[in-house]
Amino acid sequence: RDDVESRGLGDVYKRQCQNNETLHNLMIEIAPLSVSRVFLFKEQTYRGRCLVAYKDHVNDLFELSDEERNAFMADVARVTRAMDKAFHPEKINYGAYSDKLSHLHFHLAPKYVDGPDYGGVFQMNPGKVYLTDAEYQEMIEAIKKNL
C-alpha cells in the first residue's frame, strides 16, 4: 500500500475501486462501516448475499497492519451478524477471491438447507435471481436495521 501511495496512485485506485461502473452494475451500497463499505449483491441466488470491501485500496489481508486487519474482520463479522438476524440462513459462506479485481473484499453468501449449492461452494455469479428495486430496498433495510 505504501508503494501505491508513494507513486501518487492512491486517489486513482480509490476512485476506481469505490466508484467504477462494474461495481454499480453488480452491487448496491448499503452503508459505510468503520474501515469498509458493505454492498448488497444484485444477483440474489443466495438470498441476502453481500460483499464487504476495504475502504482503501489494498490487494490482500497481509498488507494491513494488525489493527487494520482486526477492524476489517470486525466489519465482516458485523455484516454477517446482521445477515443472520435479517435472513436466518443455516450458514454463511465466506469468499475472498481477487484474481480479477485486485482489491480486498469478502463475498458473504448465505446458505439455506435445500437451497442452491447447500453443502458445496457457492457460485460467483449464477445469474439466475434478480429482484425488483422494492425488493432490493427491503433487503437493504433489513440489513441496516441489524447492523
Q: Where are the regions a protein language model picked out?
A:
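Single conserved hydrophobic/aromatic residue that forms the stacking wall/gate
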Residues: R1-Y13
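C-terminal helix-cap and adjacent tail motif
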Residues: R7, R15, Y112-L147
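Short beta-strand/loop segment at the start of cytosolic alpha/beta domains
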Residues: I28-T45
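Divalent metal-coordination and catalytic microenvironments
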Residues: V38, Y54, F72, F106
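Catalytic strand-loop segment that frames the active site of acyl-thioester-processing enzymes
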Residues: L40-V58
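Short histidine-centered catalytic/ligand-binding loop motif
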Residues: K55-M73, M124-T132
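Long, well-ordered alpha-helical scaffolding segments within enzyme catalytic domains
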Residues: E68-K85, Q137-I140
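Histidine-centered divalent-metal-coordination microenvironment in nucleic-acid enzymes
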Residues: K91, K100-Q123
